[in-house]
């Protein structure tokens, strides 16, 4: 990029920071001259011209810092040359002209524009603001414990990919969860179900009396359930004492699910012990009803699998990011249910064989019709009712289809972010002499590797690749004579 002023001056005086006579002008004259001083930026053959004070608004960036941009100065053409993407630079230059507003051109891919932001060193603040405008969701930082022992334990139970023992613990946890869910389902089979809820006197046909008392402590299902609860409790307690923040521990929805998964067991155990000691038969029916509700909560243990399943985590993040669209969907369905249930009731009011005795009774029909399920237990029989039913089904299809693209877009975003993270993690296993020393790599590949160290290795890899590309391009562009590569030891060419 060349530096030019309004008057014709030679190249030595035109370059910033290089006065012609070797003496430096006064500060006031320098400030007045800087207001009019212009620079030329050549982006792959397309020249842009702007004032130097425009670039100086952001002195920490590549173009705003004279020392940084001087590497790309071509003294023969008196300009700064960048072999970068042309359409992207329109937005980059507007960032300086507007004082910090950054908008991606519609004809530039998202990943390419992100690379341009990094190359021109616009900063993390500009990158975060750009990602927010593009709809990216900021990842929450997950700090690690400060103490080494707590960090080791936290990585074992929270980061299954950090080491071999952590993977073993994750596999054991998944197996225990699956066993608990299988036991929860099998104990309801008629051939395996025992009348554990019955305590009393049984009169046989031969006039003999048998007192039947169920003992839950000898039940095989209860024994297996106890073993599962021991593991769940151990895992929860260890993770609680090893977590970096006790307050954030209880704010995590997954930890709340872990607590809910073990509470029913202790309530059931306490109720059984109280009944055996007190023998209060009058409260037996009430306690059994409570136990049935509490046992139902055990089914939430299946959500514990999401801690070890990337697919379930992606699904949960998608639903969380799509709460607004899901809320609109429920609101539209609510309006449709009220509208069509009222319409079908009055359309079928004069029919003796009508299935709709009231508007609330027609709510069920409207819901299954708008969701295109159609059980067939309730259906219109008149012409007017069938017309209302047809409109209800069509409206349901349109209502449900509206928010689906947004939800799918959110799912694709989280899915690609997860897959890209896995690909970057796989690249960490590729050996390179420019990344780190052997001792450093062996230390980072141990069981103490944290998420911050993963990011550090990734940054080293990107820097080494960028250095390798710059060396190759300089070699390729400066091998012949009469090239623009003047003073090769100082001038660098970017790709």
Curated annotation (Swiss-Prot):
Region (Disordered): 1-30
Any single biological process term in GO: regulation of muscle contraction
Residues spanned by motif Selectivity filter: 372-377
Membrane topology, Extracellular segments: 187-220, 275-287, 346-359, 380-386
Complexes and interactors: Homotetramer and heterotetramer with other channel-forming alpha subunits, such as KCNA2, KCNA4, KCNA5, KCNA6 and KCNA7. Channel activity is regulated by interaction with the beta subunits KCNAB1 and KCNAB2. Identified in a complex with KCNA2 and KCNAB2. Interacts (via C-terminus) with the PDZ domains of DLG1, DLG2 and DLG4. Interacts with LGI1 within a complex containing LGI1, KCNA4 and KCNAB1. Interacts (via N-terminus) with STX1A; this promotes channel inactivation. Interacts (via N-terminus) with the heterodimer formed by GNB1 and GNG2; this promotes channel inactivation.
Disease per record: Episodic ataxia 1: An autosomal dominant disorder characterized by brief episodes of ataxia and dysarthria. Neurological examination during and between the attacks demonstrates spontaneous, repetitive discharges in the distal musculature (myokymia) that arise from peripheral nerve. Nystagmus is absent. Myokymia isolated 1: A condition characterized by spontaneous involuntary contraction of muscle fiber groups that can be observed as vermiform movement of the overlying skin. Electromyography typically shows continuous motor unit activity with spontaneous oligo- and multiplet-discharges of high intraburst frequency (myokymic discharges). Isolated spontaneous muscle twitches occur in many persons and have no grave significance.
Protein name: Potassium voltage-gated channel subfamily A member 1
Organism, as annotated: Homo sapiens
